[in-house]
Swiss-Prot record:
InterPro entries: Alkanesulphonate_mOase_FMN-dep, Luciferase-like_dom, Luciferase-like_sf, SsuD_RutA_monooxygenase. It catalyses: an alkanesulfonate + FMNH2 + O2 = an aldehyde + FMN + sulfite + H2O + 2 H(+). GO terms for biological process: alkanesulfonate catabolic process. Catalyzes the desulfonation of aliphatic sulfonates. Belongs to the SsuD family. FMNH(2) which is absolutely required for this enzymatic reaction, is provided by SsuE. Pfam families: Bac_luciferase (PF00296). This is Alkanesulfonate monooxygenase.
Length: 382
């Protein structure tokens, strides 16, 4: 089975070491452009752009990088409860048209109540997934060309519609990750690709089977992806030295402070990530070549595949055998590691080819929209 491999744009910072300013570098537009162009040139299918208060805005970053890339797809965040589904659908269609079908969307419910409250969202975990399900229903239908009336518990819209469709038909694919039962129910019912963070193959197998069964019960099929860091070198010994070097400047206080901050999250996925290492620097190889060191201070994806090219490819195949077809990778620093992954890992993988859709016109040739409602129809010639 061919696999899709994405890279990552580190809009929240980058460097040679975790939890330290030593070896850090400025993440400005020029640097992000270098990473995006490298990923585009090296054969990555797309890039994940993170979201949250610690990051640059993912939509603006993606839009700014469209003109300087050719085939690279951009996986950007949808934030239910923070933006209306109708506006989000219009923005999604615009990004898809401007990029000629290179837009992908990642539904992010959020897991930090403190950050969400700062955004004006004061729902608990259960309520957030209710709101996310309603948001996604409206967003999908509007993008697919329907006029939507919807009266839910959290979302109410009347006459929601889109005048200019996206390039991808019927709409751009929707990605989503979440480990709770509510998240898996949402994935089974509404998304195209379910993402998991890099847990052990046994844990991932359990998740895949649960979501697959729930989707089948609704008459649907769902694709699967995984989010991992990668530390690949010419030898496995060298890769492990690089992994240990990445956390060489971490002290116990920095780790404890990070874990205390993560403890306030109500994200089941974050809780599962934290359980892999227990906040300790020893015994970080939790499965063959799967290292939990990144999660000592980084929220979200906290594990890395470590080894030489053939070894890492073998571990990737183990996940692929479970049904994973999309791998979203990253590495520190992200520019250099994109090249290492391309040179040392790609030759051992069966990579899918990126296909772009036929472009639709961004606006109709018949003229300007009338009264902000009607697209003029072409008059037939007799």
């Amino acid at each position: 089975m061919s696999i899709n491999v994405f890279w990552f744009l580190p809009t929240h910072g980058d460097g040679h070491y975790l939890g330290s300013s030593e070896g850090a570098r400025a993440v400005d537009y020029s640097y992000l452009q270098q990473i995006a162009q490298a990923a585009d040139r090296l054969g990555f299918g797309g890039v994940l752009i993170p979201t949250g208060r610690s990051c640059e805005d993912s939509w603006l970053v993606a839009a700014s990088l469209i003109p300087v890339t050719q085939r690279l797809k951009f996986l950007v965040a949808l934030r239910p409860g923070i933006i209306s589904p109708t506006l989000a659908a219009r923005q999604a269609a615009t990004l898809d048209r401007l990029s000629n079908g290179r837009a992908l969307f990642n539904l992010v419910t959020g897991g930090d109540p403190e950050e969400l409250a700062a955004e004006g969202l004061h729902l608990n975990h259960t309520e957030r997934y209710e709101a996310s399900a309603e948001f996604t229903h409206v967003w999908r239908k509007v993008l697919e060309g329907e006029t939507v009336d919807f009266a839910g518990k959290h979302i109410q819209v009347k006459g929601a519609k889109l005048l200019f469709p996206p390039v991808q038909h019927p709409r751009p694919p929707l990605y989503f990750g979440g480990s709770s039962a509510a998240a898996q129910d949402l994935a089974a019912e509404q998304v195209e690709l379910y993402l998991t963070w890099g847990e052990t193959p046994e844990q991932v197998k359990e998740k895949v089977e649960e979501v697959r069964a729930k989707a089948a019960a609704k008459g649907r099929t769902v694709r699967f992806g995984i989010r991992l860091h990668v530390i690949v070198r010419e030898t496995t010994e060298e890769a492990w030295r690089a992994a240990n070097r990445l956390i060489a400047n971490l002290d116990d206080k920095t780790i404890a402070d990070a874990q205390q901050a993560f403890a306030r999250f109500d994200s089941v996925g974050q809780q599962r990530m934290a359980a892999l290492h227990g906040g300790k620097k020893d015994n970080l190889e939790i499965s063959p070549n799967l290292w939990a060191g990144v999660g000592l201070v980084r929220g979200g994806a906290g594990t890395a595949l470590v080894g030489d090219g053939p070894t890492v490819a073998q571990r990737i195949q183990e996940y692929a055998d479970l049904g994973i077809d999309t791998f979203v990778f990253s590495g520190y620093p992200h520019l250099e590691e994109a090249y290492r992954v391309s040179e040392l890992l790609f030759p051992h993988l069966d990579l899918a080819t990126t296909e772009l859709p036929t472009q639709r016109p961004a606006t109709q040739p018949q003229g300007e929209v009338v009264a902000n409602i009607y697209v003029p129809q072409k008059v037939s010639q007799s």
